[in-house]
């Protein structure tokens, strides 16, 4: 939020809002939040979370919570969301956003945090830029997949695939005539397990995540290497009064935060 330069007075589109972690934080600051996602399950959880906090603004797409979300049937226009409230509705990157009340310059800031999952990246970035009056921002993967612990993968003898999402976004935004800026977020993640066996079988899935390059080493060899790695790096901890196991170092996931002023 701080990287996006949001102060709490803006109208913000949270595109690909998921369960609403960002949307709720923005509303708590006083922002007027339009939260859109293609997933009914995610929106149901956001709906409950926002309602519990008194942040929910009713009047999103007709039939909210059902399997049918017709466009253009709003009781509340997205541009009229009150401060500190969240208007959730179901909308995908591929939809015509104007049918949902999101025309040119509808919001101050348009954000897509770790959610630019689309077949046409350029079209999606154009849409995000078009609805913003001041600024558009995205957070995208840089380096290896967020699902993969690079240290574990290397220990298993697996070749890491680096993602170029940040380079693609930067290039497209530049080609669209904007001046993108980039900064980085390094997010530490830890996970605990109820037993060493659970840790082993959970981390063994690293091979599945890197399936395109996994044939360079046998399943048996990578599994043996993982066992050896865990013998050296799996440590016992106490969590909520119970014995658990975790790796001795957190996994750090790098993200690229890319923003650009649209100057409407």
What annotation goes with each model-predicted range?
Residues 107-122:
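A short SAM/SAH-binding and catalytic strip from SAM-dependent methyltransferases
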Residues 162-177:
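Short alpha-helix
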Residues 141-160:
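Short, glycine-/aromatic-enriched active-site segment of Class I SAM-dependent methyltransferases
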Residues 19-96:
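Class I SAM-dependent methyltransferase SAM/SAH-binding core
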Residues 1-8:
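Conserved alpha-helix/loop element of class I SAM-dependent methyltransferases that forms part
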Residues 133-143:
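Conserved beta-strand signature within the Rossmann-like core of class I S-adenosyl-L-methionine
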Residues 184-264:
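Conserved Class I S-adenosyl-L-methionine
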Residues 9-18:
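Conserved class I S-adenosyl-L-methionine
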